[in-house]
């Protein structure tokens, strides 16, 4: 299987437009594991195989256990996630499924109870950004399996 659109060739500036969002998020107020957990969950909801592969590998590189990764599809029934993570995952699903009834006040209030205003803004940007990447990846039929995480040595 080959991708049906090669964005780098077809629209060289596309990645230049998206990359600043990820650069901002890399140094935002949220911890890296939470960001990748949110990205993986949104990718599961959207059915983006390429992004599922990527963020699964990123989480493993950060030390996430297989138990937490396998349980993510059923996070509401799984004991592996903190209240903060649960609030982030609920908000992730609400924003990702926004066409099914808008982002609910219940999920927003749960998130607001766990995150500062800055963190909640960063979380919402992370969710919005991964949803854009999911749509780009699905539309192009990007092939999963080749991504390898960059492991950064601790300072």
Question: Where on the chain are the PLM-derived regions?
Answer:
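Hydrophobic alpha-helical segments
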Residues: 1-155
